[in-house]
Amino acid sequence: FNTVRLQAGSSFGTGFFYDFKIDDKIYPTIITNKHVVNNKEIEVISFHLHLSDGDKGSDENYKVTIKTKWYFHSSKDLCFCFINPVFERVKMETGKDVFYIGNDESILGSREKLEKLSALEEVTMVGYPIGLWDEKNNFPIFRRGYTASHPAFDFNDSGIGVVDMACFPGSSGSP
């Protein structure tokens, strides 16, 4: 309930929900890589959303195709879009809320937490490698791997860490 399979033209990849909190207000977004949305500020994307069944997700999915505005990081292959307008549209069209679980800053590792980790840690990637997914139930594929650089150190001053994992096209944007 945290990821979406994004399709932008002939390109596809993964996006994940992230809730920005500003002045006690939550702003839900989808974060992905720029190249997933073809490096275009405005892009038509398609994805399926789980609809709400009270306080949990239902087995009902809803396909959305929208033209959306992406906000790009100035130097990283990273972007986000505000998703609340999509949630409002889905509510208007179906009478149901979208069920999602958004990440937030609480999942980000503090310097102290990162320094306590070993250089070799098991990691999990959630996404849609080579287009694989459980289309009927709208669920992603889970992959496991390991850190290939120490999580506390900025690999080559690039602002990233390195993992050793079987990653395929479509995994881009995975959390």
Predicted regions: what they are:
Residues 1-12, 38-169, 173:
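Serine endopeptidase catalytic core focused on the charge-relay Asp
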Residues 3-29:
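A conserved glycine-rich beta-strand in the N-terminal activation segment of trypsin-fold
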Residues 32:
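Cytochrome P450 catalytic-core helices
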Residues 35:
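Histidine-centered active-site/metal-ligand motif
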